[in-house]
Amino acid sequence: MAFLNFNYQGGPKWYSMGNNPMHERTIDIARHFFDHNNLVGYEMWSNSTHNFIPEWHVDRDERLAVQEKRYSLPICNIVYYPLVENLKQGGEFYTDDIVITPKTNRLIIMSPGIFHGVKPYDNAIRSVVAINPWERRPS
């Protein structure tokens, strides 16, 4: 429940390591799969409404991509579902080659640079927290 009670304050926000131990536990798990030796912090945001469905995208430094046409990627991408209820159809997380059904307490860790999205859904509780650890703070 601690994830659900945290104030995510809208869109992506930057956090230095040590600020949110409960969220950083997901980064500790990701350390088993990705090198975090140069980790300086992470972006984090949450979504719990079916009114916003992320389209096909890759997590990246948005300013560099738009203004300088360069890709800078996080160390990895972490998606955590603290609560999913009454999801009867849709809401799946997908990439080119996999579809993952959201479930309460499910954690997804994936390599950077993988395009992904979410299938539309209605009338369900689908709380998701996205965490992107970085070797440098995105611009």
Describe every region a protein language model picked out:
Residues 1-107, 113, 117-139:
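Fe(II)/2-oxoglutarate oxygenase catalytic core
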